[in-house]
Amino acid sequence: MASEPVIAKDTVSLAITGSEAIQQPVCTFASGGANMANSPSYSGSGTSWTASILVADGDTNGDVTFSCTFEDVAGNAGAAADTTADTGDIEVENTHPTVSAFSFNDVAMKTGDTPTLTLTFSEAVVGFASGDDVTCPNGALATMSSANGGVTWTGTFTPTANTEDDTNVCSLGTSYTDANGNSGPSSDTANYAVETQAPSVNSITMSDTALKTGDTSTLTIVFSETVAGFASADDVTCPSGSLGAMSLQSGTTWTGTFTPTGNTDDDSNTCTVATSYTDSAGNAGTGATSANYDVDTVAPTVSSISLSDTDIISGDTPTLTIEFSTAASGFASADDVTCPNGALSTMTSSDSGVTWTGTFTPSGSTTDTSNTCDVGTGYTDDAGNTGGTGQSANYKVDTVAPTVSS
């Protein structure tokens, strides 16, 4: 027998040469002191025979020994041929490599994480190639390398972007062996989670997008998933007003109250969500912008109010002209303008509500040197802001006809 270690499915062959022609010998084989499981087979004739046995997976590790008996063709028994247990010619080495450890140093992976996969065997292995022997879903495993002769192997795993899967295991195949050729078992890591899906804003809306004095609007932000580290003061900007602290209404919906700034007229505003928030895994969020909203909290005012004639006598019908700072809505001269000692006709506008004119007819038989036309606050601008008051300069009414005293 040649001197080398053998493993399961190897064949051990024993050459037997007789001093004369012999019949088929009968041999028994043992390894490590225990009979080997399989029965030997024989070939040959005359003085030259071969006894062969297939090593079984369960054969005991240790030196292979044998004992053979034989007879010549006449039936005379020859001296038995055998070996002792410590000859060391051939040794069975049936110990299979096993996996001692197979794990990640991080099992909750987010964007930017690159955990290390460590695989430790019970002994040095050969024929191991991580690209062929290890599969890790939802990511890419770099080529694994060993710094201790093939016992421990490490490699970097990069999770796939835009992926959300909390059920994953790396699997080891069985194509590797130890130095003697014994195959190893398969193995799986513990579960790991891949969460590289960035949270985003599904919607950001104002309940009122045309804001006037006294209005408040509810800002509602709906995220794609539960978020962490979200603070409205830091993460949301809404110009031309102030946003109160936002509160969580459900797992993904936040609301806050927006109050427009006074004396502001700006028809181009959007609320913006920054990227400083994260999801529960730590992935940074994406920004978002609301639709446009209009802030008009500037109250309309009376720019001027004047009569074309302030010394009014019988037969005079001066024109009253009122100019507002912006187009006035809901303005009705009968309700909103008072001019004593006379009657004001219905006022009309030819420029969409900014300038209004009407005719004043003084009362008859009246003498009054102290009069003003006054504008009330019943009108608004187009946004609905209540207007301010106005007052004309003084005018005189003298419609008393002179008489002959004597």
Task: Set out the residue ranges of the language-model regions.
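Non-catalytic beta-sheet/beta-sandwich ligand-binding modules that flank or precede catalytic cores
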Residues: 1-406
